[in-house]
Amino acid sequence: KKDSIIRDQVGFEIIGSKDEKNDDKEIITTSLKSLQNLKYSSGTLTIGNVEIFKLLISKLEIPARWKLRLLRHFWRDEYFNDLLKRLETNADIDPTVVAVDKKKYLDLLKQDPTTMIAGRSIGEILKRFDTKIKDPRTASKGKKVSKIIRSFLKIKCPINNAAKELNKFFKKNKINLVVDQKYFPISNNKVSKLNVMFSTSFGRQLEYYTGMVFKIDIKSNSKIINCCSGGRYDGLISDLGSQKKVSAVGAAFNL
């Protein structure tokens, strides 16, 4: 079926990965070795890392609730863009509601904090109000943050420039982050007839990825074919029922 999510694939993975960088590199190296049996003229190895996006969001001056929203919906491209538009316009903040909340807050301050209202103590309710009142966001700040995120997701360059481009971006936007080129599993721009590219927006297709992600597209008989993809999924096994967190990284070839 055309839209089926079930695909014929053969894969390999490292379960219980203890050396993240070496194991990430091993999976990519194994994928490249497997290409030796395929006939192709050229191609692209695209590498991304969703962990960098998470680190960026953690550094931005936006309310905690917005950080959670952006991280939760990073995988939903269209909805994520809608969130950025709301962030720019303060669409989630009604000034009238804020004023009413503040009045309720001041009224509750005069009451006994142990008094229960709808199953919660006034103390708990005050704590919630306090968080909302101290977590304001102006429209200008929302626009600035949205612009930073959009600019970040446009970064695309040869892999050997990845750290340089990211650090230039962080410095320009006064983000307290620095990335070393050794952070990436590969630094050669050309491997096995493949151009190696870094992309900040790549890796948003599957929600379970937690770090490095990659795909290999090859040109064969004038057609571009996605033959392999993979990445790190340190939370997937526990999401499927494991009692403990098991780090893992793997890849699969489409048959």
Predicted regions and their residues:
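Acidic, His- and aromatic-enriched active-site or binding-groove loops in soluble protein domains
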Residues: 61-93, 218-220
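Extended alpha-helical scaffolds
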Residues: 38, 42-56, 66-70, 74-79
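Positively charged, Gly/Ser-enriched RNA/tRNA-binding surfaces
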Residues: 1-40, 90-255
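Low-complexity, flexible helical/coil segments
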Residues: 30, 45-51, 79-86, 232-236, ...
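Beta-rich nucleic-acid/ligand-interaction surfaces
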Residues: 46-59, 202-211
